[in-house]
Amino acid sequence: MAFDRELWDDRFSVSAVPAFTCPRCSKGTLQFDKKQFWKVEPKFSVDAHGHEDWDPEWVDERFAMFLKCSAEKCGEIVVVSGSASVEQVYDEEYGPSMESLLVPAMMVPAPPIIRVPERTPQEVQAELQLAFQLFWSDLGASATKIRTSVERLMDHFKVAKFKRTGGKLKPIPLFTRIETFIAKNGKVVHKDHLHALRVVGNLGTHSNAATRSDVLEAFQIYEHALDELIGKKSTVIAKLAKKLKQK
């Protein structure tokens, strides 16, 4: 699954619902059926139509939909809900027009934003799945889960979590754990990748300043890092290296 940032815009129209990857089988895509779509305008929004200055952009609706996996043997159903508003959009051929756009606040189970290698430890996968789900409702929390998954990745590589100081066990900062991992196992490029994920996670944890772009870039970096560290690519390279060493 190639990373496509446009797939993860914060809003889309009913006529252009993204074809997300199925969170269960990872093979099918989630299909939209208009018969499984509901949109309602609350009374406060309806009443506002009577205001002398009313504008279509005042409309504030709620929506819910089911997306079904295209793989016949899977058939997973994802529930999507959120708000809808009327906004001006631009078309190169027809010019500006008003269109109702859907802004998801929840997707359950959430589609995977990146491809996660099968060999990825379950503890890392669990944190990433939470990051995927929180992406739609709380970007800061999503960024924090990315950081937590890096902690679990360091656990997988048996990098120490605690050190004894003054007779007490104290947690080792993630910065130090990454440095230790790189010194023993990694490459300089992996150092940059992992520290970038740590920094984005810190933005989410401490200041809630992580933007949608920050989080998407972090996911993109993480996909590459996981593929190199524990995915098929790392296995293939390891085999090639072993073969060449025997010459």
Residues covered by each model-derived region:
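Helix-loop junctions and short alpha-helical segments
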Residues: 71-72, 76-123
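Charge-enriched, short contiguous segments at helix-coil
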Residues: 189-247
